[in-house]
Amino acid sequence: MRTVKLIVCILFFAVCAFFSLGTLITGSSVITEGGIEKPRLITETGVNRNFGNEYEEYFSRAFAYRRYVVDAWSALRVNLLHEGNDQVVVGKNGYLFFADTIDAYTGLNPMTDEEIAKAADSLLALQTYANEHGAKFCFLPAPDKNTIFPENMPSRYMRAKTTDLDRLLAALDERGVTYSDPREALTAAKSEKIYYKTDTHWTPDGAELAFALTADKLGVQMFDTNTVGRVGEAIQGDLNTLLYPGQTLTESVMTADFSDSFIYTSAFSTPMDMVITSRGGGHGKALVFRDSFCNALLGLVSSTFSETQFERANPFRLDLLGTSKADYVIVEIAERNLRNLIGSDERIKEVID
């Protein structure tokens, strides 16, 4: 018995030593979550009294070969238990879902009636301000993937009969706020690849379906993607990356080739730039407030208008209407983030006050 205990102890300390000393090997430790720095016991101000907690956090994210350990653990959970991690839900037929969408899907922790009213009032204020400055307004909620593909969710999650999005759109109807609801169109097209299996977002084709409804609400002629060719596009699914940080797994789709239909006029770096401006061959100027779901719309929207300005800041900078002279205002936001609409009109309140 003592021999067994000794072997277990030796193995335990050997594993700890391997991962600890392994951090000294160049390339063995790669931090991908937030860029945390190695803490110091002695700082410019003296002894770091929080060194223990800081080093514990650092080591948990920087121990040697962490990515491969996480990959192996995820593979075991996915293949044996059909489970992901605290950020990823493993669904059916190869679908992965973002864990942050579960509350919206199940109705757990729903928005209160007061929150719904505040979100709707903010959108009404945004629309009123846009109209007063000569711009048409449309709100575009981007449905969570499990809203469109509930059949691929694990059976343990029960879908809510009435969602926050249902309630918000009803409140917008009462207030006369213009919106486009793409859920029906996306559901009807679900046999096509309109959402990525391994990513949170819709594909370019799914995004096009949603924007077609928005353009119709605004009375705009959407750019005809049939007039350009199609090219292959491979993305590294964000959900796959959260499950398997040590692997480079891609998912491919076909998308319209917008290379000759618009140009970026800002110093474009990535689709997640805080501000992006573009010039296309369409008519009118657009001001678009958006999140990551709009990444798949950059080319299409830019090609539809003569000038477009995309903004990621919230509260929304609708005060820019004073200088941009936009003809159209679009507010796009993911279904899971509807609470972020509350107070999104603060910037125009400052201008009015």
Feature map (PLM): residue ranges:
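Extracellular glycan-modifying ectodomains
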Residues: 1-353
